[in-house]
Structures are given as C-alpha cells and as structure tokens.
Amino acid sequence: MIIHTVTVVDGNGNVLVKREFSSSVERQTYADILVDVISYIEGRKVKHVEKEILKENPDLRTKLSSAREIEDKFVVAEMVI
C-alpha cells in the first residue's frame, strides 16, 4: 500500500502540518496550493530543494516527489510504501 504525504516542517525540524492522501494527484495539488498560499501571504520566495536532499540521501530518489523551501519552512511531498 502506498501512502502519499505532504509535510510542512519549520527550520527547527518541528512538523507544522502533515496530511496523507490516497493518490499522487491529490498530494501534489495540495502541496502546490499550500506553497502558493504560504508564499503569497507571507510574501516569501520559494526555492526547490529536491537536488540538495537527494545528494545527501540518494535512497529517497524513488520516494521524494518534491521539496520546496519557503525561507524558514519546508514543504515536502513524498510517497511512503
């Protein structure tokens, strides 16, 4: 069984929000909307950080869908098998 999750983590590693979805489309749509809303409301820039994470943890290549940094927050979308 595959569980699709979106997790928002602050700069200290504390989980602020974690949601599970049954499909990758729902997961990615939620993550995209969440990033757009946070960056717009807080007026912050978004940076994709997938490459940096995969350099440090190559075994996540098949699980990590996207990872974006909004200055002091991280939004991570992934699959858990």
Curated annotation (Swiss-Prot):
This is Uncharacterized protein 70. It comes from Sulfolobus islandicus filamentous virus (isolate Iceland/Hveragerdi) (SIFV).
